[in-house]
Design a protein with these regions (language model features):
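Alpha-helical transmembrane segments in inner-membrane proteins
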Residues: 1-219
Length: 219
């Protein structure tokens, strides 16, 4: 019974966390005003704060956390290591490197989707390298070492780009990207990321039996 209630309980807790995030801000908002803003009964100011600032920010954090949790669980099964996390194979660092390139060369000024597309391409490039390595070796340790090498290379390249940043604004954008932030998010940005998150989660959930089998060993 406890196992059956665990997932519904966690979902309920996460929904409560999103609602609590809508209460908090530079000016705390009572729960009744937040609910009124959700259902259209509040004034224009409250609706603007909830629908344009706090709710997109909360949903962005929620989806990001869910994606990191799912990918981390999948990597723990794949690598048979309870400490594995999304950055262990260098995918996160490669995504950051490509995003930093787009910021360095000003590609984000050409189109608002240039930055996330660059990050996705970086992640796919690292994933392709790891997949090619996995064809040649079945050693988990080798894959982890390749991932560590990718992360180190990406980190060094990002440091070089920051040192060569053409202006303070580009440097600030690079640092903000590397640190990460859910501030100033919008539903358009969430809509851009959501299909990839949903597709990835679906693939991992469909592969959960195979990932569970891998925890038994390479044989």
């Amino acid at each position: 019974m406890t196992g059956r209630l665990l997932i519904p309980g966690l979902i309920a807790a996460s929904v409560c966390a999103v609602f609590a995030a809508c209460l908090l801000g530079s000016t705390p908002m009572p729960a009744d005003r937040v609910l009124a803003a959700f259902f259209g009964g509040a004034d224009a100011g409250d609706r603007l704060v909830i629908w344009q600032i706090r709710l997109p920010r909360a949903l962005a954090a929620y989806l990001t956390g869910a994606a990191l949790g799912i990918s981390g669980a999948a990597l723990q099964g794949l690598l048979r290591n309870p400490l594995a996390e999304p950055g262990v194979l260098g995918v996160s660092a490669s995504a950051s490197l490509f995003a930093t390139f787009s910021l360095y060369y000003g590609l984000t000024a050409l189109a608002p989707w240039a930055l996330p597309v660059a990050a996705i391409l970086g992640a796919l490039a690292a994933t392709a390298l790891i997949a090619l390595a996995a064809i040649r070796t079945r050693s988990v340790v080798t894959l982890i070492l390749i991932g560590v090498g990718l992360s180190s290379f990406a980190g060094a390249a990002m440091s070089l780009l920051m040192n060569l940043a053409p202006n303070p604004f580009s440097l600030s954008d690079m640092i903000n990207w590397m640190l990460g932030s859910v501030a100033n998010r919008s539903f358009e940005e969430i809509g851009l990321a959501a299909p990839f998150l949903i597709a990835g989660a679906g693939i991992l959930l469909a592969s959960r039996r195979g990932l569970s089998a891998l925890t038994l060993g390479e044989e």
